[in-house]
Amino acid sequence: MKPLSEAHKEFIEHLKSKKRTTSTILAYGKDIEQLINDLTERKKANVAEVTAEDIRNFLLKLEKNGYTHKSLSRKLNATKTFFRFLKIQEYITDDPASLVEHPKFDTKPPRILSPTEYRALRDAARDDVRIAAIIEVLLQTGIR
């Protein structure tokens, strides 16, 4: 059986070998570290001991601590990638993360500028023709 901490180190090395960005490696590393800390509190030391219920409980704990559904979804992405890696490496036979669904979250429509904000933005760029042209394109096309 593979200890969680050892699997975590191998996963980070795997991400580096796949040329993932530094920010991805850091984010996934911290997310998996957070998961492992939670699993350790639950007396889970090896990758084969982790269940889908453990992962769900981890996400519920984070939600109770104020994490948004979007943040939980990102952490679940890291977890799913980690467990896919473990399965490919044959450290586990079943992937418990594949049984966990992403939390639903609402996407808010973009905020529309008020007429005053619209005028202020145009006035701020009045002295620079290039910036004024860029702002006009943004304002007239609705590009975000």
Where are these regions (language model features)?
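Conserved catalytic core of the tyrosine transesterase superfamily
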Residues: 1-144
